[in-house]
Amino acid sequence: MYYSEEIGLPKTDISRWRLRSDALGRETWHYLSQSECESEPQSTFVQWLLESPDFPSPPSSDIHTPDEAARKGADFLKLLQLDNGIFPCQYKGPMFMTIGYVTANYYSKTEIPEPYRVEMIRYIVNTAHPVDGGWGLHSVDKSTCFGTTMNYVCLRLLGMEKDHPVLVKARKTLHRLGGAIKNPHWGKAWLSILNLYEWEGVNPAPPELWRLPYWLPIHPAKWWVHTRAIYLPLGYTSANRVQCELDPLLKEIRNEIYVPSQLPYESIKFGNQRNNVCGVDLYYPHTKILDFANSILSKWEAVRPKWLLNWVNKKVYDLIVKEYQNTEYLCIAPVSFAFNMVVTCHYEGSESENFKKLQNRMNDVLFHGPQGMTVMGTNGVQVWDAAFMVQYFFMTGLVDDPKYHDMIRKSYLFLVRSQFTENCVDGSFRDRRKGAWPFSTKEQGYTVSDCTAEAMKAIIMVRNHASFADIRDEIKDENLFDAVEVLLQIQNVGEWEYGSFSTYEGIKAPLLLEKLNPAEVFNNIMVEYPYVECTDSSVLGLTYFAKYYPDYKPELIQKTISSAIQYILDSQDNIDGSWYGCWGICYTYASMFALEALHTVGLDYESSSAVKKGCDFLISKQLPDGGWSESMKGCETHSYVNGENSLVVQSAWALIGLILGNYPDEEPIKRGIQFLMKRQLPTGEWKYEDIEGVFNHSCAIEYPSYRFLFPIKALGLYKNKYGDKVLV
């Protein structure tokens, strides 16, 4: 029973929810009338996710061998695939996303439909800290000022009364943390838009930077794509002092989120609070150069001429509209989407065509689940999960069973439809994307290096298998050549991190720019960074491509692979042999990818000291029950931190690395496989255990499909290498 049920909060009827998804993977939730329900049955995925008694659970059976376990897992996963080939999931974890959705609606006076409102309240309540009732940066974090303030305000704006026990408890925690004045930069900005804080107390985000010459290293177009996408509209709202009209509810909230000794609101000297951030929140403190710049810019804001601001506004809004054109009004992610929606409402009005198109996209990032409804980290994980499923069914031999062909065909065709076939509009500061794949959907519009490589590899696998000859030409060789060109473009071959691959683009500015990081709660956000995982996946894709297309730029591709491998080797920890992961937790995740990349170029435990050290590192972390467990704390501290209990996903990661690294002793690998099999339910399902992903070193995020994909891969690889033995 969830906490929301214990305290008697309203909930919707789970039988009336439907998830609709189109050919390009768009996901939207709908609450139907009883008559509509009869003509549109729930998918088995929705029945499973919402814990419906109507879910057709597979029959229970004893599982004795790795192949039986892999097949049982694949059979269960089949029930979670939609007809368009995707594996939808609630990509959740961050607790600062929903405030944008709620703020954009409140600012534009857009009413949130009742079923969504009810379930958003449930989710926030069900993710409150069980002891102090606050919220953190993410769902498994300690309570922070940022998380507690944002979610407190959300609950109030969604209709919860201030005297509700949930809010009384949360308010006590918020006051203990110093009240709303101690929010980090983004928190202060959202509060200012809501007229719950004053812009004079927010450090500047100068939109004038977009009018600077591009050749300057500080030009925002050279920043990391997420950071520039957020600070583009944030700069507009800050410079134009965009705020809601003050109403009775906002007046009430003003008197709730500050410590009583700080009130009345009108007496707070907001200009003195710009750098006042709660110590619990402060992951990346200001540098002296940033404080100096903020001091100068805050004085500039007071004297900036109106004509200059109008000139800058025009440039900023032009770039925002280009973002709409490049992403079909989705924007790169929910934070920038919400800021952009506020800007469009302010600049054009709520009756404008652009605003109405944004309203049509608002629910793309909402996802329902048993805890309630929340705003996800992006509009999904569609391409990423589909590419892995296809690959792993090939690598494990499941492809040889015709009963899995339909699954593979659906995901293959989805990947084909998801490739970018045109570039971005001119003047939007975007690199070539034609030929690339995104993380989620084609409409989202952003190239990602590892997604491109993994999708390309999956497609090549299907195109070269006799069972799928009839759909081979759904994508042409030239499309794959385009994908390779994008990967070659993204690799860092200049003066910064030679041989590495970043996420969306190559590194365009010196890493020293991080000293101007204003966010306070994240690290490594100012510019693109090199990532071992992205480099690993790019190697996997390019080596597989070279195998089937040996005549396409062989020398350049081999040079690219060789320099990437050297970067992977150079990134290994000299002491313990691990690799640090930035997108999964943490050393286990990155070590798996690194060992697989090294495996593809023929390096193993016997031939490579790096592989030997990497495998020995993983072995040293195995727990007595045969599993592995790494805490998200290691992402923050940059040192391996054991988790409390062995975890299925991390155990699968370690096993994959050991098997592909050709670790010579089968015994610890066998114990790990036995652990995976014992954790599997008789129906084939693995239950959720703990958060799997991370970003920017400090924020955890869930990848729900991982608990199926990686155990299936580990089990199949074991069977391929050691035979299908009775282990349980």
Swiss-Prot record:
Gene behind the chain: ERG7
Function: Lanosterol synthase; part of the third module of ergosterol biosynthesis pathway that includes the late steps of the pathway. ERG7 catalyzes the cyclization of (S)-2,3 oxidosqualene to lanosterol, a reaction that forms the sterol core. The third module or late pathway involves the ergosterol synthesis itself through consecutive reactions that mainly occur in the endoplasmic reticulum (ER) membrane. Firstly, the squalene synthase ERG9 catalyzes the condensation of 2 farnesyl pyrophosphate moieties to form squalene, which is the precursor of all steroids.
Any Pfam family matching the protein: SQHop_cyclase_C
Active site annotation, chain numbering: D450 (proton donor)
Reactions accelerated catalytically: (S)-2,3-epoxysqualene = lanosterol
Pathway involvement of the protein, from the record: Terpene metabolism; lanosterol biosynthesis; lanosterol from farnesyl diphosphate: step 3/3
PFTB repeat residue intervals: 117-159, 561-602, 611-657
Keywords: Endoplasmic reticulum, Isomerase, Lipid biosynthesis, Lipid droplet, Lipid metabolism, Membrane, Repeat, Steroid biosynthesis
The protein's Enzyme Commission number: 5.4.99.7
SUPFAM superfamilies xrefs: Terpenoid cyclases/Protein prenyltransferases
Example GO BP: triterpenoid biosynthetic process
Record's note on what induces expression: Expression is induced in the presence of fluconazole. Expression is up-regulated when ERG6, CYP51/ERG11 or ERG24 are deleted.
Family: Belongs to the terpene cyclase/mutase family.
GO cellular component, one term: lipid droplet
Domain of life of the native organism: Eukaryota
UniProt topology in membrane: Peripheral membrane protein
Protein name per its UniProtKB record: Lanosterol synthase
Main location: other
Molecular function GO labels: lanosterol synthase activity
Species this chain originates from: Candida albicans (strain SC5314 / ATCC MYA-2876) (Yeast)
Protein's cellular compartments: Lipid droplet; Endoplasmic reticulum membrane
